From Swiss-Prot:
Name of this protein: Ferredoxin
GO annotation, cellular component aspect: chloroplast stroma
Top-level taxon in the UniProt lineage: Eukaryota
Keywords recorded for this protein, A-Z: 2Fe-2S, Chloroplast, Electron transport, Iron, Iron-sulfur, Metal-binding, Plastid, Transport
Places the protein is found: Plastid, Chloroplast
Annotated cofactor note: Binds 1 [2Fe-2S] cluster.
Lineage per the UniProt record: Eukaryota, Viridiplantae, Streptophyta, Embryophyta, Tracheophyta
Keyword Electron transport (UniProt): yes
Function: Ferredoxins are iron-sulfur proteins that transfer electrons in a wide variety of metabolic reactions.
Length: 97
């Protein structure tokens, strides 16, 4: 399946379609959108965002704890969309405090 991903970035919102077997960060780059990242392996906070609508599968990541995921935080480098989803990007500072 392919879902609509909306990223709310500091430069304004962008939307694109993302297959459910492609990481959101990878698809964003394919579409020409620059997003923050570092390890690309789900083990740091550089690419962190916050899901405000929809659901993702980020089981490949290991950096976020259950509470952080329950709060909506997502690592875009290891997140597959499971529905149409809206994510606020550039949330590393909010995540790490």
């Amino acid at each position: 399946a392919t879902y609509k991903v909306k990223l709310v970035t500091p430069d304004g919102p962008v939307e694109f379609n993302c297959p459910d077997d492609v990481y959101i960060l990878d698809q964003a780059e394919e579409e020409g959108h620059d997003l923050p990242y570092s390890c690309r392996a789900g083990s740091c906070s550089s690419c962190a965002g916050k899901v405000t609508a929809g659901t993702v599968d980020q089981s490949d990541g290991n950096y976020l704890d259950d509470d952080q995921m329950a709060d909506g935080f997502v690592l875009t480098c290891v997140a597959y969309p499971q529905s149409d989803v809206t994510i606020e990007t550039h949330k590393e500072e909010e995540l790490t405090g």
